[in-house]
């Protein structure tokens, strides 16, 4: 099995996670309470969690398909 795709997805997730953490830090440091950036921050963190979930589900399905194919 070629693990380069898994590494690419994991690297992409790490890059997005770091970017979301930096955006979160900037929002916390710069935002004023009345600007509504809190909702943006919550949305960004939710998207980060959904991306993580999607990547993990795709990788698990791919591993199951490869294992099933190898057993035949």
UniProtKB/Swiss-Prot annotation:
Membrane topology note: Multi-pass membrane protein
Any GO BP annotation: cell division
Taxonomic classification: Bacteria, Pseudomonadati, Pseudomonadota, Gammaproteobacteria, Enterobacterales
Subunit structure of this chain's protein: Interacts with FtsL, FtsQ, FtsI, FtsN, and probably many other cell division proteins.
Transmembrane helix listed as a keyword: yes
Alphabetized UniProt keyword annotations: Cell cycle, Cell division, Cell inner membrane, Cell membrane, Membrane, Transmembrane, Transmembrane helix
Topological region Periplasmic: 31-34
Keyword Transmembrane: yes
Function comment: Could be involved in cell division. May participate in the stabilization of the cell divisome under specific conditions.
Protein name: Inner membrane protein YmgF
Gene Ontology cellular component list: division septum; plasma membrane
Residues annotated as transmembrane: 10-30, 35-55
Subcellular location as annotated: Cell inner membrane
Topology Cytoplasmic: residue spans: 1-9, 56-72
């Amino acid at each position: 099995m070629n693990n380069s795709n898994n590494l690419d997805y994991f690297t992409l997730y790490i890059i997005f996670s770091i970017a979301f953490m930096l955006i979160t830090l900037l929002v916390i440091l710069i935002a004023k309470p009345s600007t509504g950036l809190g909702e943006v921050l919550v949305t960004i963190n939710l998207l980060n969690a959904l991306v993580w979930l999607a990547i993990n589900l795709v990788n698990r399905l791919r591993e199951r398909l490869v294992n099933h194919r190898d057993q035949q």
